Amino acid sequence: GEHEAAVFEAHLTLLDDPEFTGQMEMTIENDSLNAMKAVQNVTDTFVMIFESMDDAYMRERAADIKDVSKRIISNLAGKGGSAFAITEENTVVVAHDLTPSDTAQLDRSKVCGFLTNIGGRTSHSAIMARTLEIPAVVGLGDITTSVKNGDLVIVDGIEGVAIINPSEEVVAEYK
């Protein structure tokens, strides 16, 4: 969709940014590092800068930088494809964070929602979830320690809540 395209357009813009790519080239040449290590070092610097910004929207762009970096490093290492091997239907993915690439690669025939520890309404993973019509709640703090494999979880993306092991009455309300 249009929003999905905008997210990846932002990623392409980053790849075209001479400051970002130029720093990588300089790091390889000046510090005699391999490409993967140079990408990681430059990414760490850019992420630190973006995460320290006052504007929440700009702070959330640090996640985009991490996503682009992860994909570059994965390609340099000759690895590709999805980070998830989900085999069961009605799976709720619970993670510290999901990148836009991770979100786009979720198998929608198996994943019925996702929850993350970090993120906000303007994070690209949240935007991707809305675009793909995947119920999601981001920025839950410590959801990865609260949900165990096999728990029944209701993902209420409208209210921004996750209900872990709800009563039968609550399940009936959400059906």
Describe the residue ranges of each PLM region.
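Acidic, glycine-rich flexible loop/linker segments
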Residues: 74-77, 84-175
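Conserved, well-structured core domains of diverse proteins
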Residues: 1-75, 80-81
